[in-house]
């Protein structure tokens, strides 16, 4: 199987790209770059400029946010997952650090190719909004849980 066909097959399985026809996926794969990482290598770091997003072709990576108390793991991502889109959508520095936890193959999708795809296929934009809304919901649940635990600790310590 050719590398381009393999990339298109993987892109077809990415939920965000499910409604995109094969010729457009082939063009996206052709205009993107396969980048390989070894375990423990960093794809990008929190605070870096965001000029691309990545589709995980194979392997796994961990997503971390840096805090004053050290890094916090936010998620583990694997084949067909998409990372790095927030920085290019919002034109902000990277909001997290992504580190390969195994040998990793990615498809690096540049900002222009990404926006061309979203322009031509609005359902991709809707899919991205849905994924971001899901992540925000999960973050809100986590924040609520942590806030509740903090309040409980304060009450137990007599500081509330």
PLM segments and residue spans:
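Cytosolic regulatory regions built on CNB/CRP/Popeye-like sensor folds
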Residues: 1-160
């Amino acid at each position: 199987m050719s590398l381009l066909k393999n990339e298109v097959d993987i892109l077809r399985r990415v939920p965000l790209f499910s409604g995109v026809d094969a010729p457009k996926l082939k063009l996206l794969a052709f205009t993107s770059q396969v980048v390989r990482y070894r375990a423990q290598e960093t794809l990008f770091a929190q605070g870096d400029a965001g000029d691309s997003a990545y589709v995980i072709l194979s392997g796994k990576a961990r997503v971390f946010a840096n805090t004053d108390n050290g890094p916090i793991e936010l998620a583990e991502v694997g084949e067909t997952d998409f990372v790095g889109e927030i920085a290019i959508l919002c034109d902000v520095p990277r909001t997290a650090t992504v580190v390969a936890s195994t040998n990793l193959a990615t498809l690096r999708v540049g900002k222009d190719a990404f926006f061309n795809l979203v322009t031509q296929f609005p359902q991709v934009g809707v899919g991205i909004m849905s994924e971001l809304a899901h992540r925000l919901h999960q973050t809100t649940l986590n924040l609520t849980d942590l806030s509740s635990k903090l309040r409980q600790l304060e009450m137990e310590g007599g500081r509330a």
